[in-house]
Design a protein with these regions (language model features):
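Acidic/histidine-enriched, beta-strand-rich ligand/metal-binding domains
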Residues: 2-74
Length: 74
């Protein structure tokens, strides 16, 4: 269960919004082309690295997409 999501817009060709729920270690990614995904068991350090990356999309593809379990929300 997701509690309170801290959602922020990002400058990325592929990603529109990134949210993180500190209580559940859930990362939510909203794609510009459509689709919302929730990645589970994502450490807070991984979220901070994503948010401070020079390319959010590249960082997401390399370090998160295939590394954590996820569900498609919409």
């Amino acid at each position: 269960m997701v509690t309170e999501m801290d959602v922020k817009p990002v400058r990325s060709r592929d990603l529109a919004l990134i949210g993180y729920d500190h209580a559940t270690a859930t990362l939510e990614v909203v794609f510009r082309a459509g689709g919302v995904y929730r990645y589970q068991q994502v450490p807070e350090t991984v979220y901070h690295a994503l948010m401070s990356a020079s390319s959010h999309g590249t960082h997401f593809q390399k370090y998160i997409k295939a590394q954590y379990p996820y569900v498609k929300v919409s």
